[in-house]
Amino acid sequence: MAGEVREWVSSNGKKLEAEFISGTEKFVTLRRTSDGRRFTINLDKISDEDREWVKQKLEEVEGPGKKEPSGIFEDRLNDSWEKMEFGTLKFRFWGGKKLKNTKRYPVVVFLHGRGSGGSDNEKQLFSVPRKLSSKGFYKDNPSFLIAPQCPDDNKGWRGVYIKDVIKLVNESIKHLPVDKNRIYITGLSMGGFGTWEALSIAPELFAAAVPICGGANPSIAKKIKKVPIWTHHGEADEVVRVEWTRGIVNALEKAKGNIRYTEYPEDSGIKHDAWTPCYNNPEVFEWMFSQAKNK
């Protein structure tokens, strides 16, 4: 691990060529090449890129360490959609039996649309959850899948319900071998609105988002502009007007956000059901799973 010479950048932009000697979670020890002086500095004093480099070097030597499922997730890695509860929510959880406690895996959150809410803990598995847990797909994209059910479709993914979704994701980070740099969220219709809402509350939590036929107040654009987002909407949508998505997309483009937009034209036959072409497009998932906050 030691012995590598590279250019380092301080948090205020100053550059230094130095040999990496060692590092910890809080400090890094370097030897300056110009005079051989050795010194230890706080990681807060170097750039984000350099901090991530140190972290990766430490993991190469030490590995991420074992992390057994615990808390509400103990004994829940069963290759099945486990029925669970957290806060105000009932939710389904999928974790593969073969996931290793020495590795870290992404989390995917799916927010359903209106009509799938309630308390049966069943209807929210409509659409993409079954695809993500299918044998072939899951083998190529192992992850922890979370599909919460909104207790009240009339209230939607707002207030305490979306806040509990965020708390649930943090609970998974605490008790599962989660890759904190690869937490994804997607949702359709009411869940599309919920996806935007989650981003506005905790933009630092997510590595990527795929909101479908939803929308958001353009005023949140600056807050969420660093999150990679690929949003979808049908031009002929008669349930949620396409202007809902166009507005936030335009605001993100003006804010120089990381935004990608697919609008299905009127002559495509796609109306509100923009999730079918979206989720049937393998490029969407290739893009989503390739996103990471430490890239």
Regions found by a protein language model. Give the residues of each.
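C-terminal catalytic histidine-bearing segment of alpha/beta-hydrolase fold enzymes
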Residues: 212, 228-232, 236-295
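Short, solvent-exposed loop/turn and secondary-structure capping segments
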Residues: 103-104, 118-124, 157-160, 197-198, ...
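Compositionally biased alpha-helical segments
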Residues: 1-87, 141
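Gly/Ser-rich "nucleophile elbow"/oxyanion-hole loop immediately N-terminal to the catalytic nucleophile
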Residues: 98-103, 154-190
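A domain-start/cap signature at the N-terminus of enzymes
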Residues: 60-107, 188, 198, 210, ...
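Active-site machinery of serine-nucleophile hydrolases
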Residues: 107, 111-166
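Short, proline-enriched alpha-helix->beta-strand connector loops that line the catalytic pocket
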Residues: 141, 224-229
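Primarily recognizes the serine-hydrolase "nucleophile elbow" in alpha/beta-hydrolase
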Residues: 175, 181-225
